[in-house]
Design a protein with these regions (language model features):
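Membrane-interface catalytic loops of GT-C/OST-like multi-pass glycosylation enzymes that act
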Residues: 134-137
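Bulky hydrophobic segments
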Residues: 1-127, 131-132, 153-207
Length: 207
């Protein structure tokens, strides 16, 4: 696993490029009469940084060259017991995904929608890792999805205990919640496989 300082540098070097995209997006919503609350906008900025953090931790954007050289493991549950720390880290990595989605969006209050989104995001990570950015492992897909599910249940329990805090002012007023999430995820992937490696290797000269 990368050092914390390295993770911060790599994730921030990609994140700065989505900030203007987010600003323009929320400005567009405001102009079209769909202004979002300050709390929601702030939480979305945090959520997007978290997405960059996931891709950084999983090794995406680590090299500046792209070559298709897949290393695939399709044997489920193999190595989970022998590598418990890695398994736990993969689980914890996706817990915020399951928490953020229902926290930010009304259309993600159903566990099926949340888990499916976490599964698709994790699957996208595994596919991109085939291009010289890590190993594609079905166990990661299973554990990441389980982490998303756990995050949802944490949100669900807290929302029952503190309903006003978890619903008032943070929920999106946009009818296109699901489209918005996939837009943010798409932009994150594009930046991390194109611009971010160039910044890291050419501008910052980090190996």
């Amino acid at each position: 696993m990368l050092p914390i300082s390295d993770i911060l540098i790599r994730s921030i070097s990609g994140y700065v490029f989505i900030v203007p995209v987010l600003l323009l997006y929320f400005l567009y919503l405001k102009k079209s009469g769909r202004k979002q609350s300050f709390l929601h906008i702030t939480a979305v900025f945090v959520f997007c940084y978290y997405l960059f953090g996931i891709l950084t931790v999983t090794g995406i954007g680590y090299t500046s060259t792209i070559s298709f050289c897949p290393r695939i493991s399709l044997i489920p549950f193999f190595g989970m017991i022998s590598g418990p720390i890695e398994t736990i880290l993969n689980l914890v990595l996706f817990v915020p995904m399951g928490f953020f989605l229902p926290f930010l969006y009304k259309k993600y209050h159903h566990i099926k929608t949340v888990v499916l989104t976490g599964l698709l995001f994790s699957l996208s990570v595994e596919i991109v890792q085939m291009f010289d950015w890590g190993a594609t492992d079905i166990n990661d897909l299973i554990i990441n999805t389980a982490g998303t599910c756990l995050g949802y249940w944490i949100y669900y329990l807290l929302s029952k205990i503190l309903p006003n805090y978890f619903r008032k002012g943070v929920q999106s007023e946009n009818a296109n919640d699901i489209v918005e999430v996939f837009l943010f995820a798409f932009c994150t992937f594009i930046i991390m496989v194109t611009v971010q490696p160039w910044v890291i290797h050419s501008l910052l000269n980090i190996g």
